[in-house]
Amino acid sequence: MTEQKVDWEPVIGLETHVQLGTNSKIFTSASTSFGDDPNTHIDPIVCGLPGTLPVLNKKVLEFAVKASMALNLKIAKHCKFDRKQYFYPDLPKNYQISQFDEPIAEEGWIEVEVAEKGKETYLKKIGIERLHMEEDAGKLVHAGSDRLSGSKYSLVDYNRAGVALAEIVSKPDLRSGREASEYASEIRRIVRYLGVSDGNMQEGSLRCDVNISVRRGPNAPFGTKVEIKNMNSFSAIQKACEYEIKRQISTYESGGIVHQETRLWDETKQLTKSMRSKEGSSDYRYFPDPDLGPIEVSVELQEKWRSELPELPSSKRHRYAEELGLSVYDARVLTDDYQMARYFEIVVLEGADPKLASNWITGDIAAHINANKKSFENLLLTPKQLAEMLLLISQGKISGKIAKEILPELLEKGGSPKELVEERGLGMISDPKVLGAIVDQLLSDYPNEVESYRGGKNKLQGFFVGQLMKKTSGKADPKLGNQILTKKLKGE
């Protein structure tokens, strides 16, 4: 394939399906529990059997409105549900209840930080066209293949059918695979901070479809749009976009035609494959659902839900950098995980230095959590205990080396760092008389090195510092020890 040329501009929009974290489904009391035996969470309403009537789950409405507010969308005065008609085995009713022309919210935006390779990080405002509520479909399992083509037979699990979704449709404001990936990442951060979804891509709680075309320059008409599905990571979103951009440019430049279609991303082969021609809205024959009346969210209810919104990740990043003096990178890493950010803030409230807390949390503690598949929520080392350890370091009572020695036990069992240090006799030696006596002994042990130092080999200072730390098992106060060494080496 030919490389992307300067005169071609990609145009990308994302449809992000967020599974809302309610205990029951959108129109029925059936459970939303993930990973249970197939077809154990279905009922007559999910299957659309005659005589059943759907009833909107109020928690779904609350989560959808809160997500809309966080995305700066305007909440509609009233909205309605529609039936989207299509035949596919994973849809037990042969129609999906969605929102067509009157969604819950429209016209919003978010800002994302984009770090393109070889470029400076920049902020970009991405428009959001709408957010609408709908029900999820079931899941097909193909025997002998990961798709229908090539499989011996298919099984259908309706446990997911009827689970509440919020579909977030961006405007075609994205111009690269990296921007698309960063936008999707920020959407996930936001819904996790709100507590409306776990955003788990591996479990299908957050799924993205990419709509992509290319055109000759920013003022040219949009090209033919292609939809890409089957991306289960942010890296896959970026790679799929980059591949499809090159494919479309190559097609146009060789005189071919880009067809409006749905394509699948093949993670193994790192390319997109044609799946089917893309349907238009008329193919779905939308009409208002006669079993569900229009919805109106009162101003009072909107204000109540708005007052419950937490501080969002973009605001936290800015505050950490401006008020706590953290680097942009550290602020981003901390706020990427809501539980990590919450843990960090409690540690700082307990009196720990923000930069020191950030280093330990994003370093050793995050590494422990990742290696042991834990989370900050169930960490045995409480924020208060970590703050206690960091204060011991700041006050010069233990060294960073000693802190690293006791950290594994604290992570496994919890407990007071101060008591552990006292119990093991690991406290810092900061008494000038005690350190002075140790330095005197050290200098008498290495007379030749002392003579060389006094002869002008000042680099031997590092050797003596190392020996001092070795002799004290790392417990000597580094600053005070260095001062005493310097004076005694100079014969003062």
Swiss-Prot record:
SMART domains per UniProt: GatB_Yqey
Enzyme Commission code: 6.3.5.-
InterPro entries listed in its UniProt record: Asn/Gln-tRNA_amidoTrfase_suB/E, Asn/Gln-tRNA_Trfase_suB/E_cat, Asn/Gln_amidotransferase, Asn/Gln_tRNA_amidoTrase-B-like, GatB, GatB_C_1, GatB_Yqey_C_2, Gln-tRNA_amidoTrfase_suB_CS
Keywords assigned: ATP-binding, Ligase, Nucleotide-binding, Protein biosynthesis
Example GO biological process: glutaminyl-tRNAGln biosynthesis via transamidation
Pfam families: GatB_N, GatB_Yqey
Disulfide bonds: none
Family stated for the protein in its record: Belongs to the GatB/GatE family. GatB subfamily.
PANTHER family given in the database record: GLUTAMYL-TRNA GLN AMIDOTRANSFERASE SUBUNIT B MITOCHONDRIAL AND PROKARYOTIC PET112-RELATED, GLUTAMYL-TRNA(GLN) AMIDOTRANSFERASE SUBUNIT B, MITOCHONDRIAL
NCBIfam families named among the record's database cross-references: gatB, PRK05477.1-2, PRK05477.1-4
Described function: Allows the formation of correctly charged Asn-tRNA(Asn) or Gln-tRNA(Gln) through the transamidation of misacylated Asp-tRNA(Asn) or Glu-tRNA(Gln) in organisms which lack either or both of asparaginyl-tRNA or glutaminyl-tRNA synthetases. The reaction takes place in the presence of glutamine and ATP through an activated phospho-Asp-tRNA(Asn) or phospho-Glu-tRNA(Gln).
Subunit structure: Heterotrimer of A, B and C subunits.
Protein name as it appears in the record: Aspartyl/glutamyl-tRNA(Asn/Gln) amidotransferase subunit B
The species this protein was found in: Prochlorococcus marinus (strain SARG / CCMP1375 / SS120)
